[in-house]
Amino acid sequence: MRIDAISIGKNPPDDINVIVEVPVGGHPIKYEMDKDAGALIVDRFLYTPMTYPGNYGFVPHTLSDDGDPIDVLICNTRPLVPGCVINVRPIGVMIMEDDGGKDEKILAVPAPKLTQRYDKVHNYTDLPEITLKQIEHFFEHYKDLEPGKWVKMGGWQDVDVAKKLIVEAIERYKTQG
C-alpha cells in the first residue's frame, strides 16, 4: 500500500480517511502500519487480554505531538480488515497521555454514505454513556501489565476540539513530516 497516495479526506477536518490498523473485537494484538514500507506489522501483543472497543487506525498525512499520525477510534460494531481505508467524520476526542507523551484519540463514526446508523450522532455526547465508559476503560487499562508503560486519562472533549487537533496535525505534517 502506498500511504502517500491515500488522501486525508474530501473535506478535512469534517470528512477524513482512516487507515485501519486494528479491528473492533479482534485479538489483543497491536498492529501498526509501517509508513515507509506500506506494510502492516505486529507492534506488540497486548499483555492485558482486552479487545479494542472500535476499529482503530490513523489519518494519513497528519502528525501528532507524539510523532505519529493522529489516532482514531471508529465507533462501529463491525470489524474492518486491517489496512483498509474508511471515510469517517469526527465526533469528539479522548484526551490522554502515556509513557510516550500526549496521545489523544479522535473518536469518529463512519461517513453517512457508508451507513445511516450514525446520522444523529454529531458529538461524542450523542453516544450511549456505556459506550464512552467502555472506551475509557479500554484505554485506561490496556497497558496495565506492560512493564514501564502507563496511561493517564484526561477526559472527553467535543467535536470542535477534535477538528482543531486534526487541523493542527495536518499543518504539523506539512511543516515537519
From Swiss-Prot:
Coiled-coil region: none
Subcellular location as annotated: Cytoplasm
GO BP annotation list: phosphate-containing compound metabolic process
A GO molecular function held by the record: magnesium ion binding
Reaction catalysed by this enzyme: diphosphate + H2O = 2 phosphate + H(+)
Binding residues annotated for Mg(2+) 2, in chain numbering: 71
Binding-site list for Mg(2+) 1: 66, 71, 103
GO cellular component, one term: cytoplasm
Record protein name field: Inorganic pyrophosphatase
Species in which this protein is naturally found: Agrobacterium fabrum (strain C58 / ATCC 33970)
Phylogenetic placement of the source organism: Bacteria, Pseudomonadati, Pseudomonadota, Alphaproteobacteria, Hyphomicrobiales
